[in-house]
Amino acid sequence: MADVHDKATRSKNMRAIATRDTAIEKRLASLLTGQGLAFRVQDASLPGRPDFVVDEYRCVIFTHGCFWHHHHCYLFKVPATRTEFWLEKIGKNVERDRRDISRLQELGWRVLIVWECALRGREKLTDEALTERLEEWICGEGASAQIDTQGIHLLA
Protein backbone atom coordinates (compact mmCIF):
# COMPACT_ATOMS: atom_id res chain seq x y z
CA MET A 1 0.00 0.00 0.00
CA ALA A 2 1.29 3.45 -0.89
CA ASP A 3 2.13 6.01 1.79
CA VAL A 4 -0.70 8.50 2.36
CA HIS A 5 1.83 11.34 2.72
CA ASP A 6 4.20 12.76 0.16
CA LYS A 7 7.94 12.40 0.78
CA ALA A 8 8.37 15.88 2.32
CA THR A 9 5.47 15.41 4.76
CA ARG A 10 6.65 11.94 5.78
CA SER A 11 10.18 13.28 6.32
CA LYS A 12 8.83 16.12 8.49
CA ASN A 13 6.76 13.66 10.55
CA MET A 14 9.72 11.33 11.08
CA ARG A 15 11.98 14.23 12.16
CA ALA A 16 9.40 15.18 14.80
CA ILE A 17 9.89 11.89 16.64
CA ALA A 18 11.91 12.70 19.75
CA THR A 19 15.34 11.12 20.06
CA ARG A 20 16.26 12.60 23.45
CA ASP A 21 14.46 13.68 26.62
CA THR A 22 11.67 11.22 25.90
CA ALA A 23 9.23 10.25 28.66
CA ILE A 24 11.01 6.93 29.22
CA GLU A 25 14.41 8.65 29.42
CA LYS A 26 13.05 11.17 31.92
CA ARG A 27 11.64 8.39 34.11
CA LEU A 28 14.95 6.53 34.08
CA ALA A 29 16.93 9.73 34.77
CA SER A 30 14.73 10.38 37.79
CA LEU A 31 15.37 6.89 39.15
CA LEU A 32 19.14 7.17 38.60
CA THR A 33 19.20 10.58 40.29
CA GLY A 34 17.18 9.15 43.18
CA GLN A 35 19.92 6.55 43.67
CA GLY A 36 22.50 9.32 43.94
CA LEU A 37 24.30 8.28 40.76
CA ALA A 38 26.25 10.80 38.73
CA PHE A 39 25.69 10.30 35.02
CA ARG A 40 26.13 11.95 31.65
CA VAL A 41 23.51 11.89 28.92
CA GLN A 42 23.70 11.28 25.18
CA ASP A 43 27.49 10.98 24.96
CA ALA A 44 28.21 11.32 21.24
CA SER A 45 31.83 10.24 21.71
CA LEU A 46 30.72 6.67 22.51
CA PRO A 47 29.36 4.17 19.98
CA GLY A 48 25.58 4.37 19.75
CA ARG A 49 25.39 7.59 21.78
CA PRO A 50 24.24 5.94 25.03
CA ASP A 51 21.33 7.62 26.80
CA PHE A 52 23.15 7.46 30.15
CA VAL A 53 26.82 7.00 31.01
CA VAL A 54 27.78 6.15 34.60
CA ASP A 55 31.55 6.62 34.63
CA GLU A 56 32.01 5.50 38.24
CA TYR A 57 30.83 1.99 37.33
CA ARG A 58 32.07 2.01 33.72
CA CYS A 59 28.59 1.31 32.40
CA VAL A 60 26.21 2.74 29.82
CA ILE A 61 22.44 2.52 29.67
CA PHE A 62 20.20 2.66 26.62
CA THR A 63 16.44 3.16 26.75
CA HIS A 64 15.12 1.28 23.75
CA GLY A 65 11.68 1.78 22.28
CA CYS A 66 10.10 -1.63 21.77
CA PHE A 67 8.90 -0.78 18.24
CA TRP A 68 12.07 0.88 16.94
CA HIS A 69 14.41 -1.80 18.31
CA HIS A 70 12.17 -4.87 17.76
CA HIS A 71 11.57 -6.11 21.27
CA HIS A 72 9.49 -9.28 21.44
CA CYS A 73 6.78 -7.90 23.72
CA TYR A 74 3.19 -6.71 23.57
CA LEU A 75 4.26 -3.19 22.51
CA PHE A 76 5.84 -4.38 19.25
CA LYS A 77 3.50 -4.81 16.32
CA VAL A 78 4.54 -5.03 12.68
CA PRO A 79 2.74 -2.25 10.78
CA ALA A 80 0.05 -3.46 8.40
CA THR A 81 1.11 -0.98 5.71
CA ARG A 82 4.54 -0.85 4.08
CA THR A 83 5.50 -3.95 6.05
CA GLU A 84 8.67 -4.68 4.09
CA PHE A 85 9.89 -1.09 4.50
CA TRP A 86 9.35 -1.15 8.27
CA LEU A 87 10.89 -4.58 8.78
CA GLU A 88 13.97 -3.51 6.83
CA LYS A 89 14.24 -0.22 8.76
CA ILE A 90 13.81 -1.89 12.15
CA GLY A 91 16.19 -4.69 11.12
CA LYS A 92 18.87 -2.08 10.39
CA ASN A 93 18.28 -0.57 13.85
CA VAL A 94 18.74 -3.99 15.47
CA GLU A 95 21.93 -4.63 13.50
CA ARG A 96 23.30 -1.18 14.44
CA ASP A 97 22.44 -1.88 18.12
CA ARG A 98 24.42 -5.15 18.01
CA ARG A 99 27.38 -3.41 16.40
CA ASP A 100 27.32 -0.54 18.93
CA ILE A 101 27.03 -2.89 21.92
CA SER A 102 29.93 -4.97 20.65
CA ARG A 103 32.09 -1.87 20.17
CA LEU A 104 31.22 -0.57 23.65
CA GLN A 105 32.14 -3.91 25.21
CA GLU A 106 35.44 -3.94 23.30
CA LEU A 107 36.13 -0.52 24.85
CA GLY A 108 35.52 -1.97 28.32
CA TRP A 109 31.99 -0.67 28.94
CA ARG A 110 29.18 -2.74 30.42
CA VAL A 111 25.88 -2.21 28.60
CA LEU A 112 22.34 -2.19 29.99
CA ILE A 113 19.27 -1.92 27.80
CA VAL A 114 16.08 -0.82 29.52
CA TRP A 115 13.13 -1.62 27.28
CA GLU A 116 10.21 0.76 26.89
CA CYS A 117 7.76 -1.90 28.13
CA ALA A 118 9.54 -1.90 31.52
CA LEU A 119 9.06 1.87 31.79
CA ARG A 120 5.54 2.45 30.47
CA GLY A 121 2.39 0.59 29.56
CA ARG A 122 0.12 -1.85 31.34
CA GLU A 123 2.93 -4.22 32.35
CA LYS A 124 5.55 -1.65 33.37
CA LEU A 125 7.71 -2.25 36.42
CA THR A 126 7.09 -0.20 39.54
CA ASP A 127 9.66 2.44 40.45
CA GLU A 128 10.73 0.23 43.36
CA ALA A 129 11.22 -2.87 41.18
CA LEU A 130 13.03 -0.91 38.48
CA THR A 131 15.28 0.82 41.02
CA GLU A 132 16.19 -2.56 42.54
CA ARG A 133 17.10 -3.99 39.12
CA LEU A 134 19.15 -0.90 38.22
CA GLU A 135 21.06 -0.95 41.50
CA GLU A 136 21.58 -4.72 41.27
CA TRP A 137 23.12 -4.42 37.82
CA ILE A 138 25.05 -1.15 38.16
CA CYS A 139 26.63 -1.91 41.53
CA GLY A 140 26.98 -5.65 40.94
CA GLU A 141 29.36 -5.09 38.04
CA GLY A 142 27.89 -8.07 36.19
CA ALA A 143 27.81 -8.75 32.48
CA SER A 144 25.83 -6.69 29.98
CA ALA A 145 22.09 -7.14 30.46
CA GLN A 146 18.59 -5.95 29.64
CA ILE A 147 15.56 -5.05 31.72
CA ASP A 148 12.04 -5.73 30.50
CA THR A 149 8.68 -6.50 32.12
CA GLN A 150 10.04 -9.87 33.30
CA GLY A 151 13.00 -8.35 35.15
CA ILE A 152 16.70 -8.43 34.34
CA HIS A 153 18.37 -10.86 31.90
CA LEU A 154 21.81 -11.21 30.36
CA LEU A 155 22.14 -9.87 26.83
CA ALA A 156 22.08 -12.71 24.31
Curated annotation (Swiss-Prot):
Per UniProt, Mg(2+) 1 binds at: D51, T63
Any GO MF annotation of the entry: metal ion binding
Top enzyme class, one word, equals hydrolase
* Names of the cofactor(s): Mg(2+); Zn(2+)
Q: Spell out the SUPFAM superfamilies in the cross-references.
A: Restriction endonuclease-like
- List the Pfam families hit by this protein, alphabetically: Vsr
Residues that, per the record, bind Mg(2+) 2 = D51
UniProt entry tagged with the keyword ATP-binding: no
Keyword terms, alphabetized = DNA damage, DNA repair, Endonuclease, Hydrolase, Magnesium, Metal-binding, Nuclease, Zinc
Q: Name one GO biological process term.
A: mismatch repair
Gene3D superfamilies xref list: VSR Endonuclease
The EC number(s) given in the record are: 3.1.-.-
Q: Which residues cross the membrane?
A: none
- Cofactor: how bound: Binds 2 magnesium ions per subunit.
Query: NCBIfam families of this UniProt entry?
Result: vsr (TIGR00632)
Task: Give the function comment from the record.
Answer: Deamination of 5-methylcytosine in DNA results in T/G mismatches. If unrepaired, these mismatches can lead to C-to-T transition mutations. The very short patch (VSP) repair process in E.coli counteracts the mutagenic process by repairing the mismatches in favor of the G-containing strand. This enzyme is an endonuclease that nicks double-stranded DNA within the sequence CT(AT)GN or NT(AT)GG next to the thymidine residue that is mismatched to 2'-deoxyguanosine. The incision is mismatch-dependent and strand-specific.
Q: Which family does it belong to?
A: Belongs to the Vsr family.
Q: Would you tell me the protein name for this molecule?
A: DNA mismatch endonuclease Vsr
Gene designation = vsr
